């Protein structure tokens, strides 16, 4: 859990090393609703919030048709063998630098 938020936080830390990135995440609809209620009440001001509808996320959630343990093995192999580890290295990402260099973009 927290994979997307962690990736975003890692990129923010790369671009702004002195910035503190706080993350709060929830799994399952009940926990997501609780997280949102707490955020609305001001508990998570300044946090990067991540909510996953399925407990266990996309790979381990209730809608999966494959064994989550086997799927995790395949995913980890894919990650290990991926031609790049950072989205900025992907030839398919063409505008991420626009965010970094945009004076109106606030992190």
Kindly label every feature range from the protein language model:
Residues 1-107:
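Iron-sulfur (Fe-S) cluster-binding modules
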């Amino acid at each position: 859990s927290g994979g997307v938020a962690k990736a975003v936080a890692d990129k923010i830390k790369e671009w702004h090393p002195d910035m503190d990135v706080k993350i709060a995440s929830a799994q399952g609809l009940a926990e997501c609703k609780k997280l949102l209620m707490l955020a609305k009440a001001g508990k998570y001001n300044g946090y990067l919030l991540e909510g996953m509808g399925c407990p266990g996320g996309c790979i381990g959630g209730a809608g999966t048709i494959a064994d989550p343990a086997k799927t995790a093995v395949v995913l980890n192999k894919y990650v290990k063998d991926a031609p790049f580890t950072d989205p900025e290295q992907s030839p398919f990402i063409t505008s991420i630098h626009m965010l970094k260099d945009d004076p109106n973009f606030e992190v």
